[in-house]
Regions:
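Short polybasic linear motifs
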Residues: 4-11, 17-26
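N-terminal catalytic cores of peptidoglycan-degrading enzymes
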Residues: 29-81
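A cross-taxonomic marker for long C-terminal extensions/tails that follow the last structured domain
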Residues: 34-43, 176-223
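STAS-typified acidic loop motif
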Residues: 74-119
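Short, glycine-/small-residue-enriched flexible loop/hinge segments at domain edges that mediate gating
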Residues: 104-109, 126-150
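Charged helix-capping and loop-helix junction motifs
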Residues: 119-122, 150-157
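Short beta-alpha junction loops
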Residues: 138-144, 169-179
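A short acidic (Asp/Glu
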Residues: 146-154, 179-183
Length: 223
């Protein structure tokens, strides 16, 4: 059983118990979600399902059946389930020697009702960190909404990554999603903004993307 599934999705007595389905900001993406594949141009170099150290080792994907959905919108079957009901991901590349991972996300990031960060932190990030990963590049152009909850897991992730000389960079997250993160005061745990908001990352090899993002991060940290 995954670690996060053993933890309570705790809500305080004053927390809203129900939130109506959000009106997603990009309607055209709604109807096309089943056609959006995770980036696949690096698959000849890395596949998480064949990586014995990956949380997704041994994962199988149907080419014909849509097994995942965000509300009533089916997702392409190549996306991986991280435990959330609305947020899915793909580990595009992991380099254990250099200590970094490039992770792509799709769906709705809902900490308020789903405590999505708990699943991400406990079941994905922690196993990766146990194998020396401390630098995380999160690609979020297909994250359509963000709903804030508690910041405990963000704080924990930030502290643990920082202690290992690492960081968490957000790449190409939508403006309204970044605004919602800033409003919840969790942007302080990430590197975001500037070049990271408009990077043509698909044109890079993974090590070149890491070098570019790492250079930006170092300039930001040294500013």
């Amino acid at each position: 059983m995954r670690a996060a599934s053993r933890e309570l999705r705790a809500t305080s007595s004053g927390m809203v118990k129900h939130v109506a389905r959000s009106s997603w900001h990009v309607a055209s993406l709604h109807s096309a979600m089943h056609t959006l594949e995770p980036f696949y141009n690096w698959r000849h170099r890395y596949t998480a399902e064949e990586d014995a150290r990956s949380p997704f080792f041994g994962q199988e994907h149907s080419e014909f059946e849509f097994t995942h959905a965000v509300y009533d919108h089916a997702l392409h079957p190549q996306w991986d389930d991280l435990g959330s009901e609305t947020l899915y991901m793909k580990a595009l590349f992991v380099d254990y020697d250099e200590g970094y991972a490039i992770l792509e996300f799709i769906g709705e990031w809902n900490d308020l009702l789903g405590n999505d960060i708990m699943f991400l932190k406990r079941d994905i990030v922690e196993p990766m960190m146990s194998h020396g990963i401390s630098k995380f590049i999160l690609v979020g152009e297909n994250v359509l909404n963000f709903h804030a909850g508690d910041d405990e897991y963000y704080n924990e992730w930030y502290d643990e990554a920082s202690d290992a000389d690492g960081w968490i960079a957000l790449l190409n997250f939508r403006e309204h999603v970044r605004d919602d993160m800033k409003a919840a005061d969790i942007d302080k745990y990430f590197l975001l903004g500037g070049q990271l908001d408009q990077m043509d990352w698909r044109t890079f090899e993974p090590e070149d993307l890491f070098e570019k993002v790492s250079g930006f991060v170092q300039r930001r940290l040294n500013a």
